Structures are given as C-alpha cells and as structure tokens.
Amino acid sequence: SFNALVSTGMLLCLITAGIDLSVGANATFAACLAGMLVNKGMNNPVLLLVVAIVGGTLIGWINGMLLTRLHLPHPFVSTLGMKNVLWGGALIITNSQMVSFSGNDAVMWLGSSTVAGFPVSFIVVLVIYVIMHILLTKTALGRSIYCVGGNPEAARLSGINSANVLTFCY
C-alpha cells in the first residue's frame, strides 16, 4: 500500500507534465519524523499521522516553491536535490538507527489488521483513491491541474494561477 499511496501523490505531478523524484524520500522522511516522536515516548497515533502528513506536505510545498518561485529550469533538478537532502535529514533525525513502531498497538493495527477480510492499509488506499478521483474529476482545482498540464500558458491566460496549481501539486 505504500507504493500505491506514493503513486497517488505522484499522479498530480505527472498530470502537470512534471516529475517529483523526491516522493519516496519525502515519505521516508515523514515516517522518520513520526518514528522520532515514538522514540521520545509519543504513542498517540493520530498525532503521529498528523506530524507525518504535515511534514510531507511542507516538503512538497518547498518543492513547489523552488519550481514556481525560484524558476528552477526543470522539476527534475529541484526534486533530485530535495531527495538527497531528505535522505540526509532522515539519517540525522534517526541517528542512523532503525526506528521501530512495534510498541505502538494502534500503528501496528493499521499495518497488520483486516476488516471484512481486507487489510486496513488496502482500505485506506481505496479511500484515498476515491478522494483523488473526486478531486480530479469534480472540482475546479482538478480541472485546473489538467489545464496547467496541457498548456500552462493557455491556463494562465484563461485566469488560472499556474504557479499556485503547480505548488499545490508538488
């Protein structure tokens, strides 16, 4: 389910004719942030999830800002650099040690339990896929993402803030 969730986020970048090489490192860094909190005694799974999501979103925002505000030549360059920064950051915050969530029953439940015979992680992926489908097909933001991917200049001329859409996608 990890690859399925990462590919969902990557889909937005691909639709806008870009690429984000840092998605795996971003997910790893976010998990290491949560792992650092577990090592410090935090056992609230909701807070761990919020920290991981906020951390990953912040990194994506930085990637988007590097691309749209600093006008780096191609997303390949900025996200490749960010990938290396995130790998280093993950090693620093974990002190190059393996982090285990085995003492946290709620986190273990998410990764190993089933509901009606389906793994919980699979159900989470399905929910995220449905949300992404609704976002891309039923909202103005979804149409804007497709427009920016098709022709950023035409999207800008039609009133779409291409820079904001690209920043959102990363």
What spans do the regions from the language model cover?
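Generic alpha-helical transmembrane segments of integral inner-membrane proteins
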Residues: 8-9, 50-62, 89, 123-131
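Transmembrane helix-bundle core of multi-pass membrane transporters
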Residues: 75-139, 164-168
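Alpha-helical transmembrane segments within multi-pass membrane transporters and channels
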Residues: 42-82
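Hydrophobic alpha-helical transmembrane segments
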Residues: 3-4, 25-29, 46-54, 76-77, ...
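Short coil/turn motifs that cap or connect alpha-helices
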Residues: 62, 151, 161-163
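Single transmembrane alpha-helix segments in multi-pass membrane proteins
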Residues: 1-41, 66-71
